[in-house]
């Protein structure tokens, strides 16, 4: 089965956290509540689960499948699954399970060995080809930060973007020189490719070049990010700057932390403060943040009028 390649992600695509019960099980009721709240905002185009914000690699295969199936049933926007398996055959099997569970597309993570060692020329292209041809899952090209060896050079991005089955890119290169150089070329060579920023901590800087956002930040400030997207598309810098500045204390409290992985914990604390989650339980290797950090997040949300 091959799915629709015409998904419209031109707007906000939040990456929901995965709520857990206090004893550590996936809390599908809480996830449905979160997903329904997010999908209820006009301008939310999809929900992207099982990635970093969603602790997707911390879930068993059975939990991943159940999470896709239950969220798909709960919301009326497409559910997109993170595909994180290390080997290509493993990723294809993961993609097949995602399709069977109801996912409409896949956010394709690089093979994580590449983070340290880099990749052989042609290997990323083969990963995307196999996932689409063998699982029928439409693919989002995921550009990792420039600081890793798993980020793709421009030629690799262009080749993947031109492959059948690839309809969008989530770009998190976090190098503005490369962003300013590569995004215009991707746009010129692939005019139908939907370009989404995932620079949670650099949204203003990337807002004027994109079709939308695919961000964990969307968990906690969906209305504000939809407003930011509209300002970016209108090339209204003053309006975009106003949203950015209003959210800046939240951005700092959630994402300007010692490790970007702490952002997931901070997102859950923010959702707790907003009354969307009852608690902020995470799975190892994530650990709880301090009471002082939680208070910092609460005060930041208050300053942005989010609570």
Predicted features along the sequence, with ranges:
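Catalytic alpha/beta core domains of metabolic enzymes, predominantly
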Residues: 145-251, 255, 259
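A general structural signal for well-ordered alpha-helical segments in protein cores
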Residues: 31, 68, 91, 128, ...
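Active-site beta->alpha loop and helix N-cap motifs at the rims of alpha/beta catalytic domains
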Residues: 2-151, 287
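C-terminal alpha-helical cap/extension of soluble enzyme domains
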Residues: 8, 13-17, 37-43, 209, ...
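Short helix-capping segments at alpha-helix termini
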Residues: 73-77, 102, 135-137, 162-165, ...
């Amino acid at each position: 089965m091959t799915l629709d390649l015409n998904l419209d992600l031109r707007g906000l695509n939040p990456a929901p956290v995965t709520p857990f019960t206090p004893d550590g099980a996936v809390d599908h009721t809480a996830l449905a509540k979160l997903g329904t709240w997010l999908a209820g905002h006009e301008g939310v185009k999809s929900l992207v689960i099982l990635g970093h914000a969603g602790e997707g690699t911390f879930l068993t295969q059975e939990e991943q499948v159940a999470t896709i199936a239950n969220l798909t049933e709960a919301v009326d926007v497409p559910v997109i699954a993170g595909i994180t398996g290390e080997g290509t055959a493993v990723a294809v099997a993961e993609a097949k399970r995602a399709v069977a569970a109801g996912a409409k597309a896949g956010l394709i993570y690089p093979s994580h060995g590449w983070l340290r060692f880099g990749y052989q020329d042609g290997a990323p292209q083969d990963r995307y080809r196999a996932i689409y041809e063998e699982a029928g899952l439409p693919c989002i090209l995921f550009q990792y930060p420039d600081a890793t060896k798993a980020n793709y050079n421009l030629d690799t991005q262009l080749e993947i973007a031109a492959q059948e089955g690839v309809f969008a890119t989530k770009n998190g290169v976090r190098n503005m020189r490369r962003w300013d150089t590569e995004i215009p070329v991707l746009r010129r060579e692939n005019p139908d490719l939907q370009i989404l920023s995932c620079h949670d901590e650099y949204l203003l800087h990337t807002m004027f070049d994109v079709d939308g956002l695919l961000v964990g930040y969307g968990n906690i400030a969906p209305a504000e990010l939809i407003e930011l997207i509209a300002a970016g598309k209108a090339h209204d810098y003053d309006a975009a700057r106003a949203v950015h500045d209003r959210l800046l204390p939240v951005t700092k409290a959630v994402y300007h932390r010692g490790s970007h992985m702490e952002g997931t914990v901070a997102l859950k604390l923010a959702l707790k403060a907003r009354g969307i989650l009852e608690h902020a339980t995470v799975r190892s290797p994530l650990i709880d943040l301090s009471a002082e950090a939680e208070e910092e997040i609460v005060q930041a949300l208050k300053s942005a009028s989010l609570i």
